[in-house]
Amino acid sequence: MVLSAADKTNVKGVFSKIGGHAEEYGAETLERMFIAYPQTKTYFPHFDLSHGSAQIKAHGKKVAAALVEAVNHIDDIAGALSKLSDLHAQKLRVDPVNFKFLGHCFLVVVAIHHPAALTPEVHASLDKFLCAVGAVLTAKYR
C-alpha cells in the first residue's frame, strides 16, 4: 500500500498528538481487541487478560513501540519491521486477519482520545498506514 505525502503528514500528525500516551493506547487497543474479537485471545494463553494487567500493559508497550517505529520509518516500514515480520510469520504464526482487528481497535482508541484530530482524511490516512503495517507483518507468510 502506497502512502501519499498527505497520508504521511496525517499519520505523523496523529502520532504527535498521541505522544506520551502510546503505551497506554497500545494496552487499551489490546484490551479492546480481546473483547471485540475474543478469538484473538488464543495467541496469549499465558497472559492475564484482565483489565490493566501487567502483561497486557507490557505487550501494549511493544505494539505501541512497533507502530512508532513504523511512523519513524514511514518511507521504509518493511525495513523497520522486518524482524517483527519474521517473528510473527515464522515463530508466532498469527493469523493475518488479527492485524486488521488490531488496526481497527487502534483507530477506535485514537477516535476516543482525539476525536477532533480524526477527520475523514486523517482517518483514511491512518487506516492506510495500519493496513500497510499489517501487510508488512504478513509479507513473509507462506
UniProtKB/Swiss-Prot annotation:
Positions bound to heme b: 88
Keywords: Heme, Iron, Metal-binding, Oxygen transport, Transport
GO cellular component, one term: hemoglobin complex
Ranges for domain Globin: 2-142
Domain of life: Eukaryota
UniProt xrefs under SUPFAM superfamilies: Globin-like (SSF46458)
Gene Ontology MF terms in the entry: haptoglobin binding; heme binding; iron ion binding; organic acid binding; oxygen binding; oxygen carrier activity; peroxidase activity
Residues the record lists as binding O2: 59
Tissues in which the protein is found: Red blood cells.
InterPro entries according to UniProt: Globin (IPR000971), Globin-like_sf (IPR009050), Globin/Proto (IPR012292), Hemoglobin_a-typ (IPR002338), Hemoglobin_oxygen_transport (IPR050056), Hemoglobin_pi (IPR002339)
Single GO BP term: hydrogen peroxide catabolic process
Pfam family, one: Globin
Annotated function: Involved in oxygen transport from the lung to the various peripheral tissues.
Subunit field text: Heterotetramer of two alpha chains and two beta chains.
Protein family (similarity comment): Belongs to the globin family.
Identification of the protein by name: Hemoglobin subunit alpha-A
